[in-house]
């Protein structure tokens, strides 16, 4: 039985862990050929798949983006059918009066500028083939001011605006661009950070919101897994969502309702 992404060529950033790796695995399951990208080494779970290629690089470096796209085109015969911008970094919950330059610069570079440059690089190929699908990973922080620090919040809000502009501008070329906004997901994006660097005063203002989010859960509730978010990405990349373009889709157990 053919998968819903059969023979499509897809670039997946953040493919070494979390939502990115889960999405790469799901895309391969659905028949896609995947070019994975991450700053971390290639995950062992994907090394033996002959439809998977990998580039270890820092997307904050512009030459890395050019290399990723050119290598993907070379390996997969001049095609890029879809781009999943999933790579992301978190801030230390700093507010506008405490955010460090390093937090701000890194969040904007990885969460906003890299997706823009990758889209800029793949759009010509997609336009030439009159088909393309771009899915950008935002966050609850992309639609709320009370979910993260100012750097992460600004970068994820910006990504939504960027995506809407791309969706409108290139709809005539049969290129779709949608956004997924996950809530709390069991990944390493926060656990890998140093809590001593957090702005705890700013973080304390968010805790009541988080308390409301995680209250009133059904019996047996568990935190959302990367694989659950990945299935949403696969749906948006498939022909089942052919009329969905420019959408911002929350995957957050009703967090977006408050």
From Swiss-Prot:
Keyword Oxidoreductase set for record:
yes
- List the keywords (alphabetical): NADP, Oxidoreductase
Q: Which GO terms describe its molecular function?
A: oxidoreductase activity
Per the record, the pathway is: Secondary metabolite biosynthesis; terpenoid biosynthesis
* Gene disruption: observed consequences: Abolishes the production of 15-deoxyoxalicine B and accumulates decaturin F.
Q: Supply the Pfam families for this chain.
A: adh_short
- The EC number on file is 1.1.1.-
Summarize where NADP(+) binds, as residue positions. Answer: 12, 58, 120, 152, 156, 185
Q: What protein family is recorded?
A: Belongs to the short-chain dehydrogenases/reductases (SDR) family.
Q: What does the function comment of this entry state?
A: Short-chain dehydrogenase/reductase; part of the gene cluster that mediates the biosynthesis of 15-deoxyoxalicine B. The first step of the pathway is the synthesis of nicotinyl-CoA from nicotinic acid by the nicotinic acid-CoA ligase olcI. Nicotinyl-CoA is then a substrate of polyketide synthase olcA to produce 4-hydroxy-6-(3-pyridinyl)-2H-pyran-2-one (HPPO) which is further prenylated by the polyprenyl transferase olcH to yield geranylgeranyl-HPPO. Geranylgeranyl pyrophosphate is provided by the cluster-specific geranylgeranyl pyrophosphate synthase olcC.
Further information in the entry reads:
The 15-deoxyoxalicine B cluster is a rare cluster that contains its own geranylgeranyl pyrophosphate synthase (olcC), in contrast to other related clusters which rely on a FPP/GGPP synthase localized outside of the cluster.
Output this protein's name. Short-chain dehydrogenase/reductase olcF
Q: What is the lineage of its organism?
A: Eukaryota, Fungi, Dikarya, Ascomycota, Pezizomycotina
| Encoding gene (name) | olcF
């Amino acid at each position: 039985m053919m998968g819903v992404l059969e023979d499509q060529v897809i670039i997946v950033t953040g493919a070494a862990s979390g939502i990115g790796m889960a999405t790469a695995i799901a895309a391969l399951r659905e028949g896609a050929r995947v070019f994975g990208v991450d700053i971390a080494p290639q995950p062992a779970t994907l090394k033996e798949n002959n439809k998977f290629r990998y580039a270890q690089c820092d997307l904050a470096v512009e030459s890395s983006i050019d290399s990723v796209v050119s290598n993907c085109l070379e390996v997969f015969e001049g095609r890029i059918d879809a781009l999943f911008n999933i790579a992301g970094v978190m801030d230390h919950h700093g507010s506008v009066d405490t955010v460090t330059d390093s937090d701000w610069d890194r969040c904007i570079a990885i969460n906003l500028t890299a997706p823009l440059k990758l889209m800029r690089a793949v759009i010509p190929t997609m336009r030439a083939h009159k088909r393309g699908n771009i899915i950008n990973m935002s966050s609850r922080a992309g639609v709320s001011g009370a979910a993260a620090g100012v750097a992460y919040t600004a970068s994820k809000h910006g990504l939504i605006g960027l995506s809407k502009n791309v969706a409108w501008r290139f709809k005539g070329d049969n290129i779709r661009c949608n956004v997924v906004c996950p809530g709390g997901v069991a990944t390493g994006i926060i656990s890998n950070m140093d809590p001593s660097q957090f702005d705890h005063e700013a973080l304390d203002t968010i805790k009541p919101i988080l308390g409301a989010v995680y209250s009133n859960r059904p019996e047996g509730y568990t935190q959302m897994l990367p694989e659950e978010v990945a299935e949403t990405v696969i749906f948006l990349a498939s022909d089942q969502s052919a009329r969905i373009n420019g959408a911002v889709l929350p995957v957050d157990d009703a967090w977006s309702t408050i």
